[in-house]
Every structure is written in structure tokens, then in C-alpha cells.
């Protein structure tokens, strides 16, 4: 399942609910072409790994404070968290790397 974050409190609540699972934070922008291209693959992976992965989308224009907290400078950027700790991060719409990082961390 892919869930779009509304604000910092929403993010904190979702991170608490996702305890024990791999969390993929997808920092995107509605005007970002590569973000739109990778979105279907991310949705597919979230369904494929629904028991072990939670995907949280963060619109950098709506949630600037969260983007700043994670030092996001380009989109899409994927931040991978396990039990609240960052285990990986990369920028770019690389579907194979996205799947590889998920597989390596579940």
C-alpha cells in the first residue's frame, strides 16, 4: 500500500504504525517527470511486499519541513528506514535499484 503523508504529525504516526517493517519514504513533486515514471513501479513493489514494506509518499512542496529534515535536494529521493533508523538512501528514478534495496532490507 502506498500512503501519502499530509504533515509531520501524520509521518510520525505512520512511522509508529510501521514498526518492524521496512519504510520507504518517496520524496516527490507533482511536477517531476521521473517521479511520475517510477510511481507505478513503486506501487507494484508496495503490493508485492505488502507484508514487510510500507511506502510513504512525501510531496516536497506540501511538506517542505519534512523534506528539509531529510536534506532532500532532488526528486525522486528514496529514504529507507527500519525501526526508525535510516538504512539506505538514493536519488533518481532507478526501478531496479529500488527493488534491489527493498529486497536487501526486508
UniProtKB/Swiss-Prot annotation:
Disulfide bonds join 32-35. GO terms for molecular function: glutathione disulfide oxidoreductase activity; protein-disulfide reductase activity. The record marks 33-34 as: Contributes to redox potential value. GO terms for biological process: cell redox homeostasis; determination of adult lifespan; response to oxidative stress. Keywords: Disulfide bond, Electron transport, Redox-active center, Transport. Residues 2-106 form the Thioredoxin domain. The active site is at 32 (nucleophile), 35 (nucleophile). The record marks 26 as: Deprotonates C-terminal active site Cys. PROSITE patterns: THIOREDOXIN_1, THIOREDOXIN_2. Pfam families: Thioredoxin. One of its GO terms (cellular component) is nucleus. InterPro entries: Thioredoxin, Thioredoxin-like_sf, Thioredoxin_CS, Thioredoxin_domain. Belongs to the thioredoxin family. Participates in various redox reactions through the reversible oxidation of its active center dithiol to a disulfide and catalyzes dithiol-disulfide exchange reactions. As a reducing substrate of peroxiredoxin 1, thioredoxin 2 is preferred over thioredoxin 1. This is Thioredoxin-2. The gene is Trx2.
